[in-house]
Regions:
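Short acidic-glycine-tyrosine-enriched beta hairpin
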Residues: 2, 14-34
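Histidine-centered metal-chelating micro-motifs
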Residues: 9, 29-30, 34-40
Length: 115
């Protein structure tokens, strides 16, 4: 992902290990390692614009055997997606703090409501 405009950060981590934070700004390049969980956060006052380059086309759907399968399926059901209510509380705390530091409101509250 190439950041074209805006400021924020990405969280990246392999299953069962510590979350690592990487701050970004225009010109930054973010490349999550294969098989790692990752999230991207706009914590600034301006919209973020980015160019996401990825595998997953018809030609490269199974590059390195990882594919995109189950990216939208909950990890509890064998997928690769961590639902908001199941994420590490540190993720939400970090975003709340980043928004407060930038003087912006966290607009994600409605998505954190338990289903």
């Amino acid at each position: 992902m190439i950041i074209l405009a805006g400021n924020g950060y990405s969280l990246l981590w392999p299953r069962g290990q510590a979350i690592k934070r990487f701050d970004w700004k225009p010109g930054s390049l973010v490349v999550p390692p294969g098989g790692w969980f990752h999230q991207h956060f706009n914590s600034g006052a301006e919209p973020v614009r980015y160019l996401a380059l990825r595998w997953g086309s018809q030609k490269y759907h199974e590059m390195w055997g990882e594919g995109r399968g189950k990216a939208d399926v909950d990890v509890k059901l064998g997928g690769k997606q961590i639902d908001y209510e199941d994420e590490d509380p540190l993720v939400r705390t970090m975003f709340d703090e980043a928004c407060a530091k930038a003087g912006v409101k966290n607009l994600m509250e409605k998505y954190y409501q338990v289903k």
